[in-house]
UniProtKB/Swiss-Prot annotation:
It is an enzyme of class 3 (hydrolase). It comes from the Eukaryota. This is Lysozyme g. Keywords: Antimicrobial, Bacteriolytic enzyme, Glycosidase, Hydrolase. It comes from Cyprinus carpio (Common carp). GO terms for molecular function: lysozyme activity. PANTHER family: LYSOZYME G FAMILY MEMBER, LYSOZYME G-RELATED. Gene3D superfamilies: 1.10.530.10. One of its GO terms (biological process) is defense response to Gram-positive bacterium. Its EC number is 3.2.1.17. Belongs to the glycosyl hydrolase 23 family.
Length: 185
């Protein structure tokens, strides 16, 4: 299957920060931490695998990235109450922010995952316009960072995660995606 937004396995990553790793009381950081975090979410996320794969195929988006974002955003649904995060702004497995978008579908539905994937694709395209000299993989990672904090906060590739949650959002998601790929996503 051709994923038109870039090759996840070619995206550089520094992994997760110590703060992100501490979510699961991990004492490791870097590239190993996201693998452990994703592993902890795998059993919960397996029930969504067919849906993730279907949406990925339809949108030409790597399903491993969708799975990784579900892991990072909601821990495969574990942190949600009635589909919402504790502050009440993010909805669903992929945490569509109601302040910027009108969430559609049930929190764990194909409609929701499709909407969130389309939002990610829009960010990747905006990053490509803003940084026309970036490689496709750099734009992919930039789009992931923008999904977390907005396009205007992505100002350079070197500082791609400086304004993201945990100061590691795109690197963490990429490392989780690379791990999910090894699990058949």
């Amino acid at each position: 299957m051709a994923y038109i937004y870039g090759d996840t396995m070619k995206i550089d990553t520094t992994g997760a920060s110590e703060a992100t790793a501490k979510q699961d009381k991990l004492t490791i950081k870097g590239v190993e931490a996201p693998k452990k975090l994703a592993e902890h979410d795998l059993a919960r996320g397996e029930k969504y695998k067919n849906m993730i794969t279907k949406v990925g195929k339809a949108k030409k988006m790597d399903p491993a990235v969708i799975a990784a974002m579900i892991s990072r955003e909601s821990r495969a649904g574990a942190v949600l109450k009635n589909g919402w995060e504790p502050a009440g702004n993010g909805f669903g497995l992929m945490q569509v922010d109601k302040r910027s978008h009108t969430p559609v579908g049930a929190w764990d539905s194909e409609q929701h995952v499709t909407q969130a994937t389309e939002i990610l694709i829009g960010f990747i395209k905006e990053i490509k316009v803003n940084f026309p000299k970036w490689t496709q993989e750099q734009c992919f990672k930039g789009g992931i960072a923008a999904y977390n904090k907005g396009v205007s906060r992505v100002t350079s590739y070197e500082n791609i995660d400086v304004k993201t949650t945990g100061l590691d959002y795109s690197s963490d998601v990429v490392a989780r995606a690379q791990w999910f790929r090894s699990k058949g996503y």
